[in-house]
């Protein structure tokens, strides 16, 4: 669905950020109640297509129970010569305001419609000829599935702690997945737990200014506790993670970044501020081999799950690693 007639409006981040609503086809079985996504970018990006501010661009995909607010990440890309765009997917973030069940998406491929439209806007309307897809956590899984399904649409992938497998032992993953698959067919809206889900509350407390952290995001859009994990959502995630394990054959260069250490729900706030308490970094590293033939893995000491929200030294190392890699791979 083309959104060429949709105007830009001031974004919640304030100037120079603007938001553009992307209407999408409703899908009651895959993303009930969701009818739009929101593309966020700086006002200067929407200049004449013949003369974009930067020829290269990045499209950022957020994680579960998340939205785009990391303006320092955007600034790092802008300073490196990339226009920055972020897509709050249907039922998520800005596009989930007023939604009965935010982030209740049972097949991530339903997001293909808004990703396709965002890329059309970036390339055709705004005139960028090189586009990088940057995904965090669930957004990282979204990014690799998109790149595998739609070769030639993006020029590189940057993955920030991508969710490539379910945390836990092989036994937990096998039996847990079978149970979730069965439950999702009977009651996809059933709220369930998952290994690691409790860690996210400790994670938020370690990062948000209300508790012990540095950051001040909107807790209505990225709450603590996080939005419920539902059976339909997790079953959909597991289907795609199995595809990853079978091999995706992505044909563009991929950078996978993650912390050096994982921790559990029992981690102290201090430990949560310098490790990944959501995913297993060893799993991330192992599953990265199935993405394609050109994969670079970079671990960030004392990085948190969203590496862009790590402490100052780890954050700087992550951003520097990304920009150096892009400079090396995209001449």
Regions found by a protein language model. Give the residues of each.
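Alpha/beta-hydrolase active-site loop
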Residues: 104-124
């Amino acid at each position: 669905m083309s959104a060429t007639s949709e105007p830009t409006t001031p974004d919640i981040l304030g100037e120079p950020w603007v938001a553009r609503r992307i209407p999408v086809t409703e899908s009651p079985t895959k993303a009930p109640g969701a009818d739009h996504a929101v593309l966020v970018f700086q006002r200067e990006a929407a200049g004449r297509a013949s003369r974009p501010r930067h020829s290269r661009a990045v499209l950022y995909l957020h994680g579960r129970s998340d939205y785009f607010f990391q303006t320092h990440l955007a600034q790092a890309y802008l300073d490196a010569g990339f226009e920055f765009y972020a897509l709050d997917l249907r039922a998520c973030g800005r596009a989930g305001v007023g939604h009965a069940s935010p982030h209740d998406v049972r097949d991530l491929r339903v997001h293909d419609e808004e990703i396709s439209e965002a890329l059309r806007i970036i390339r055709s309307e705004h005139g960028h000829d090189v586009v990088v897809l940057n995904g965090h956590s669930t957004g990282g899984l979204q990014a690799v599935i998109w790149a595998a399904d739609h070769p030639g649409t993006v020029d590189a992938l940057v993955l920030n702690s991508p969710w490539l497998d379910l945390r836990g032992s092989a036994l937990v993953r096998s039996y847990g997945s079978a149970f979730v698959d069965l439950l999702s067919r009977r009651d996809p809206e059933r709220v369930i737990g998952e290994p690691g889900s409790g860690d996210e509350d400790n994670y938020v407390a370690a990062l948000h200014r209300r508790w012990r952290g540095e950051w001040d995001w909107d807790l209505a859009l990225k709450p603590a506790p996080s939005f419920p994990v539902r059976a339909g959502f997790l079953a959909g995630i597991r289907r795609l993670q199995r595809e990853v394990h079978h091999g995706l054959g992505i044909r563009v260069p991929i950078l996978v970044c993650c912390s050096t250490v994982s921790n559990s729900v029992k981690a102290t706030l201090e430990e949560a501020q310098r490790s990944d308490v959501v995913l297993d970094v060893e799993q991330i590293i192992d599953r990265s081999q199935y993405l394609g033939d050109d994969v670079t893995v970079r671990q960030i000491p004392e990085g948190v799950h969203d590496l862009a929200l790590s402490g100052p030294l780890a954050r700087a190392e992550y951003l520097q690693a990304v920009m150096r890699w892009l400079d090396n791979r995209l001449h």
